[in-house]
Amino acid sequence: MHDNILIGPDAHGRFNLQMLRAFEGAGSIQRGKHKVNDGVYLSCDPDAAVAGRYESSSANMLQLRMQASGNTRWQALHVELGGLCLHQAAVFGIVARSVAPASITTRLCLRSGNGDHFVDSFFPKTMVSFNQASTHLDVMDLSSNPDLPKQAEWRDLILFFRSGEVSLTLLDLRLFAV
């Protein structure tokens, strides 16, 4: 366990991403939920046939290789944001750098939960990863998102990957609430 000395409403999420950038390890991906590092996990449809590997190193924040067959409902990367309070924020945003051997799209979402109930709020843009490193910047205008609760018991930043084969390297991921 490491100490989080970051401040601000988004400190919990920024700390989890900082720890992922420093993490070096690998593991297998199967259906269900799989911890990558503290506060970061992969979630795949438990009813689907999903297999793959992930690897994190100093050169690549997270490299994913997944294969899913059948009617896969979701394949996703979750970053826990704690109880991120958005009362004083105007926007919530992300900056992601990625690369993929073939173009692939990823939908980004802020999930806000209270108990077992949650609300998904999707960012307006779709992230596209190419065969050369690219940067994706997206912001969610909180005033134009009335279904997004300003306060929640827990929140996750979720990257929803397309169903089927996923081959993607996340070079860096940053988030901010301002």
Model-assigned labels for residue ranges:
Residues 101-113:
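Beta-strand acidic-aromatic groove motif in beta-rich domains, primarily in extracellular
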Residues 65-87, 115-119:
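Secreted extracellular polysaccharide-interacting domains
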Residues 117-152:
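Extracellular carbohydrate recognition and processing domains
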Residues 80-104:
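Extra-cytoplasmic beta-strand recognition segments
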Residues 138-177:
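Extracellular beta-strand ligand-recognition surfaces/modules
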Residues 61, 76, 89-93, 135-137:
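Intrinsic-disorder/low-complexity, polar/charged segments enriched in Ser/Thr/Lys/Arg/Asp/Glu/Gln
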Residues 1-48:
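Extracellular carbohydrate-recognition regions
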Residues 49-72, 126-132:
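Short carbohydrate-recognition loop motifs
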